[in-house]
Amino acid sequence: MRFIHHLSLPSRDLKRAARFYDPVMKALGYRRVWTDKNVIGYGLVDRQDQFALRLRKRERRMTGDGFHIAFVAPSRKAVDAFYQAAMKHGGKDNGGSGLNPEYGKNYYAAFVFDPDGYRIEAVINGRV
């Protein structure tokens, strides 16, 4: 059972967001499942997005300073691939990729900023 059905964020530039999120989400096993002129959505099954970006050009403040999203990764290799894809496609480093024992003995994550400035993370938190 999932805890959250879906999450949607505003984006000032959907084309730029797609260039970033298409390879980043692919590294975690997701793909783009929905596209129209104002929305792109990612998930596992067509038209059933779990994460979406919506065009919002006029919003001054997008989210609060403490806001961030952590995506579940299937492996440490996927976390590293997420980080590399983010760096290659317009993301900015926010802590790199590796073990983070301050969050737990097996907490392996990558932390980046997306092109809209959101703090995003990929994490696997368990024995490998």
Where are these regions (language model features)?
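N-terminal beta-strand motif that seeds the catalytic metal site of vicinal oxygen chelate
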Residues: M1-A18, I69, G126-V128
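Core segments of cupin and vicinal oxygen chelate
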Residues: S8-Q50
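Vicinal oxygen chelate
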Residues: S11-R16, F71-P115
